[in-house]
Amino acid sequence: MPTINQLVRKGRLAIKAKSKVPALEACPQKRGVCTRVYTTTPKKPNSALRKVCKVRLTNGFEVISYIGGEGHNLQEHSVVLIRGGRVKDLPGVRYHTVRGSLDTAGVKDRKQSRSKYGAKRPK
């Protein structure tokens, strides 16, 4: 327990909140270039081939980003937009690619939740 005099001299240290998405640097999204597009398998109770890409961001960070939706057109050197949001069953994946923005096409034939997948309204 500090004395009053010690508190006057030093003060209490405020606890700093650690960011869950450090590569975004407090921005809502960041642009980057795909350096590798591949599939990976999820953690124990689940089984699938999840589509992910390694992205070199404009600020120099290299992150792994999840590609949501059925099918995608990404390949190496594609320019993508990254947002925060982890994938619980993929360790190390803390970002999502934004569908329907820059080089990422929206999901084809998507009828519901279209705004999340960059799909236009069907005629």
Swiss-Prot record:
InterPro entries: NA-bd_OB-fold, Ribosomal_uS12, Ribosomal_uS12_bac
Highest classification ranks of the organism: Bacteria, Pseudomonadati, Pseudomonadota, Betaproteobacteria, Neisseriales
A biological process term (GO) from this entry: translation
Function as written in the Swiss-Prot or TrEMBL entry: With S4 and S5 plays an important role in translational accuracy.
Biased composition (Basic residues): 113-123
Protein name in the entry: Small ribosomal subunit protein uS12
Region Disordered, annotated ranges: 101-123
Modified residues (3-methylthioaspartic acid): 89
Keyword presence, Ribonucleoprotein: yes
Subunit note: Part of the 30S ribosomal subunit. Contacts proteins S8 and S17. May interact with IF1 in the 30S initiation complex.
Family: Belongs to the universal ribosomal protein uS12 family.
Keyword tRNA-binding attached: yes
GO molecular function terms attached to this record: rRNA binding; structural constituent of ribosome; tRNA binding
Domain of life: Bacteria
One GO cellular component, as annotated: small ribosomal subunit
Record keywords: Methylation, Ribonucleoprotein, Ribosomal protein, RNA-binding, rRNA-binding, tRNA-binding
